[in-house]
Amino acid sequence: MTDQPFLNHMKIKYLLPLALIAISFTYITATTVIPPTFEQLVQQAELIFQGTVTDVRSVWEGEGAQRHINTYVTFQIGENMKGNAGSSYTIRILGGTVGDETMEVTDTPKFKMGDRDILFVEHNNDQFVPLVGINNGRFHVQRDGQTGRDIIVNGEREPVRDVTKFGREEESVSAAEAISPDQFKSAIQKQLTDQADRSAQ
């Protein structure tokens, strides 16, 4: 059996209530995720879009032992690259803070108002983080303080230089070497075209 670059969302759904009982909604440790390649990111995603965060809202949901906090993050869509997220799209992520109670899930992305991101979305409302490879499916558009240009950083806020290195160890990259959002989106479009051509053969 080959390793999968993303979590089995059905397993997460069944194991979650037991984890919540055991730790009283304090911390959940995520299973180690094998970083997907760029090809896997594009292929696995049901939606790929660039958007700006316009709302972040955490609420208690569920009953009894399955009561937990979900966070809803809404994006104003700037560009759809795969699928159609419409003009506004909301993802649901397990965990968050309501009042003075926090339920934290390690390795999950944290969003705030005004964030500009390119997301690779799968199984929204069905798995605890609806991104391909969890934090690997989020790419942040960040303004470089030295040059003033927008660059792409990954879920760990590390500058991205070469999409072909995804899923493999890459040496440290400086902000000056990072690709722009337009370059990243061009790489996505090329991968989508290549995958469509292979499917048509």
PLM-predicted stretches and their roles:
Residues K11-Q201:
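Transition segments tied to proteolytic processing and entry into folded domains
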Residues T2-Y14:
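Positively charged n-region of N-terminal signal peptides that target proteins for export
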